Amino acid sequence: EGTVDDRLVILPLAKSTEILFVNKTAFDRFSAETGAALDELSTWEGLYAMAERYAEWSGGKSFFVHDYHFNYFQVGVESLGESFFDKDGIAFGPAFTRAWKPYARAALTGGLWLGSGYATEPLRTGDAIASVASSASVLYYSDVVTDENNRTEKVEIISLPCPIFEGGEKLVMQRGTGICTVKSTPEREKACMTFLKWLTEAKRNVDFATSLGYMPVTKEGFDRDLPA
C-alpha cells in the first residue's frame, strides 16, 4: 500500500478494516419471535435473507446498512474469483450478478437501508439494527438508541466478522491514513524524517492509532504492544 511504480510514496500511520456491528438488544427481540440466529450473519446470503425476514416482521423497517456499497461489490466479486474491473471499467460478470441479486431483493423489500449519511446514524435511531462499517467508526456507535418519537433505550452493540459469500474467499477491505512528503530544504527533510520515525515506532504507533479507533501499522506493534 502507498506505492506507485514500486516506490513508497505514502508512509502508513494507521489502519482500519470493515466489520459487522449489530444492535444485539434489538436482534434478540427479533430472534425470540423468529428464531433468527447470529451465525446466519456469517454469509452475505444469510444476512440479506434475514434482512428480508426482518422487514416483513417489523412492518417494513430496515435490518442492515452498509457504509460502503462500492466496497461490497468490489470485494464480493474478487472473493468469488473474478476481477471487478476490466479495460473498460467495471466488469459486470456472473460474480457481480451473484452479489447484486440478494442485495437488490433486500433493498426492494425495505430490509436494506439506502438512506444518506453514515451507517452509525440509522443504528443510533433504531432505523436499522446491523451495519458494516469501518472498524474505526466504533467510536461513533452509541449504546443508547433514540427513535423518531424521542424514546430512548439502552442497547448492547456487538461486533462480528464481515460476512463472506458462500464458497467465496475470506476477503475484506482495508484502508488507512498515511503521510506524504515533498522536497524541501535538507534541514526540513531531516526534521520530517525524525518525526515520522518517532511516530511509527511500534509502541508509540499502537498508542497513537488505538486512541483514534484505528489499528497500528507494524507487525511488531500488533504482536507485542497491541492491548489484548
Describe the predicted segments one by one.
Residues 18-22, 77, 179-181:
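Short glycine- and hydrophobic/aromatic-rich loop-to-beta-strand nucleating segment
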Residues 1-27, 62, 159-172:
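A structural signal for short loop-to-beta-strand junctions that line the ligand-binding cleft
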Residues 26-37, 57, 185-192:
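Short helix-loop capping/hinge motifs at secondary-structure junctions, enriched
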Residues 105-111, 147-221:
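Extracytoplasmic/periplasmic substrate-recognition and gating elements
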Residues 129-134, 140-141:
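Paired acidic/hydrophobic, glycine-rich loop segments that form the ligand-binding mouth/hinge
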Residues 3-13, 18, 45-95, 128:
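Extracytoplasmic/periplasmic solute-binding protein
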Residues 42-48, 112-125:
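Short helix-initiation/N-cap motifs at beta->coil->alpha
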Residues 48-53, 86-116, 162:
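Glycine-centered hinge/linker elements that transmit conformational signals in sensory
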